[in-house]
Amino acid sequence: MKKIMITGALGQIGTELVVKCREIYGTDNVLATDIREPEADSPVQNGPFEILDVTDRDRMFELVRDFEADSLMHMAALLSATAEKNPILAWDLNMGGLMNALEATRTYNLHFFTPSSIGAFGDSTPKVNTPQVTIQQPTTMYGVNKVAGELLCQYYFKRFGVDTRSVRFPGLISHVKEPGGGTTDYAVEIYFKAVREGHYTSFIDKGTYMDMMYMDDAIEAIIKLMEADDAKLETRNGYNLSAMSFDPEMVKEAIQEYYPNFTLDYDVDPIRQGIANSWPDSIDTNCSRGEWGFDPKYDLASMTKLMLEAIEQKDTVKNNN
């Protein structure tokens, strides 16, 4: 990869992906795009940025062509809970945007990455140690979009020889940008509330285990996969990824190592709880580890320490300004 265009660059993943890619490949070699302008304090501000509605095929082609990109990272999407409330919009954005990105990739002979998700699994999927290849059958519009997206990526690889690469992300946890619209958001919100209020009310019930990963490991995984030897990659629809699996009570206990008085209660959101119940408790990542060296560095304990320290520092800086 030498010149990279990133869609959805202001999202939770996109923001940190832009920063890391600019560190590695050079600021001017990474074009960030999104449907809105970045905020004044956004780290995306320090390099090339263009407005892009990913459903606008002509505009996407224009940006790829004018920037002379050799790689496209398509991160723009409507997330799980938001997609469930707006299924038509979700289909139009998630599928229309992906088709435009794949067509741009095919037309301009790009390297291509787009994320799938554990949301691609459903009620009939094995819940524990979920295999790489298994029954999926999701029960949400977001999950349907992700399965269809996986199949499209595989189709473009087999039919047109397009270099498509993807991973099934678990819940991603970061202090840089607070998320919005996801079922796993509680696992980010809980840290901010612990520092700022000493209490959190979870919309996901106790005993609900979901796969998770610290954002640094997720960004590293994207770059490692994109730099991997093409000949070693046997999966083109989406590699299973996970670094840990936990429920809200486990996060509470990890936080109480640093905030002993932190408390947790529950006000379960039936929509997001239903989505979570349809997902695996834990997934098998052996294919990712074996084919391109996936090796996450953070577990719940080390991630908790970093999250709390980072939020404390962020609040200190904000209060001093």
Swiss-Prot record:
GO molecular function, one term: L-threonine 3-dehydrogenase activity
Listed SUPFAM superfamilies: NAD(P)-binding Rossmann-fold domains
Classification via Pfam families: Epimerase (PF01370)
One record GO biological process: threonine catabolic process
PANTHER family the record matches: L-THREONINE 3-DEHYDROGENASE, L-THREONINE 3-DEHYDROGENASE, MITOCHONDRIAL
Record family assignment: Belongs to the NAD(P)-dependent epimerase/dehydratase family.
The name this protein goes by in its record: Uncharacterized epimerase/dehydratase SAB0504
Protein's organism: Staphylococcus aureus (strain bovine RF122 / ET3-1)
Lineage, opening ranks: Bacteria, Bacillati, Bacillota, Bacilli, Bacillales
